[in-house]
């Protein structure tokens, strides 16, 4: 059942939607953009969403920008030949205005690639929602429904946003992505402040504000490759060929997997082909993979990996099997984690991952473990330390597990 506040919020938003027909003009010229954005500069916050396509490209192609303040909505056509987006990018770095997104990473990546700026100050309603008890990675339509009671029409989600003209249905869909976001933001902001949890967002927001998040250095591309290697020399080769793939994907503006798949990189790192003939013998490589005639440059990258001084490599991750004691400790940590999560009304995996628990159980309590840092340490990590030292125990009362100081 919706509350009176939710009903009022929906009525207010539906009233705004009823006036969309006169507000759905798509801005295609710089002068109109400057006029429209001037009305947003006096706002405390602006909600933002973008529509883009990137199925066949490395870089996202920005197709539409949606903005809303408490009393204004703006639709921008970034594809127009008559528009300069500088006024928009200037707004993104205006320190007086909070930029509100839902699941901001891809939107910011698109903005950063095109304009070289990262919106700041920043508020992400997906992150805030996870802290306010809405679960991990809640979708936009779900959080709108839970906060306002309104069910969004998502049927236009996968339409071709690069095609012009955009339909009225597409524009209505696009505007809904920022108008309802206003109500969600205000509700979550109030709840965070009430529970004194605003600072809990700091670590996640810091990642979103870091340029490295959107422009990964070539020499770190290997960290994103899925697959296991066991030997230092394999790691050296993987580093070089993953960097090679990153360069080629950017050069040709196509997805990394269209250059070569992760499983192929792993096989090459292990087999270390010396020439193109060796390369053709690999089972994971499709015979028609080399459509850009770049096999010789891949072999060169392999040779570079074979010449790397192994002493300069980072340590390979260790996959030590858990002993009986460590497994038991992990079970106890899971019990503690569930208790803490229930007490704070948030999902357990937002506080600590299975990997965090395994490291803690093995005696690693370094601050670079997310669960042992920041607000997570305040509510869970500190108790985990005390439990490992025998200072916290569990007891059963009225069918419920509780903790007590020992």
From Swiss-Prot:
Names of required cofactors: a divalent metal cation
Protein task: Exonuclease involved in the 3' processing of various precursor tRNAs. Initiates hydrolysis at the 3'-terminus of an RNA molecule and releases 5'-mononucleotides.
HRDC domain residues are 231-312
For the protein in the UniProt heading, the enzyme class is hydrolase
Q: Name one Pfam family in it.
A: HRDC
Q: Which NCBIfam families would you find in this protein's record? A: rnd
Q: List the disulfide bonds.
A: none
What is the annotated localization of this protein?
Cytoplasm
Q: What InterPro entries does the record tag this protein with?
A: 3'-5'_exonuclease_dom, HRDC-like_sf, HRDC_dom, HRDC_dom_sf, RNase_D, RNase_D-like, RNaseH-like_sf, RNaseH_sf
**Family affiliation:** Belongs to the RNase D family.
Reactions that this protein is recorded to catalyse: Exonucleolytic cleavage that removes extra residues from the 3'-terminus of tRNA to produce 5'-mononucleotides
Q: Which domain of life is it from?
A: Bacteria
Q: Which GO terms describe its molecular function?
A: 3'-5' exonuclease activity; nucleic acid binding; nucleotide binding; ribonuclease D activity
Tell me the protein's name: Ribonuclease D
Where it mainly occurs, coarsely classed, is cytoplasm
Q: For this UniProt entry, what's an example GO CC term?
A: cytoplasm
Q: Please give the SMART domains that the UniProt record associates with this protein.
A: 35EXOc (SM00474), HRDC (SM00341)
For this protein, what is the EC number? 3.1.13.5
Q: Please give the biological process terms from Gene Ontology that the record holds.
A: tRNA 3'-end processing
Its keywords, alphabetically, are: Cytoplasm, Exonuclease, Hydrolase, Nuclease, tRNA processing
User: What residue stretches are annotated with the 3'-5' exonuclease domain?
Assistant: 26-193
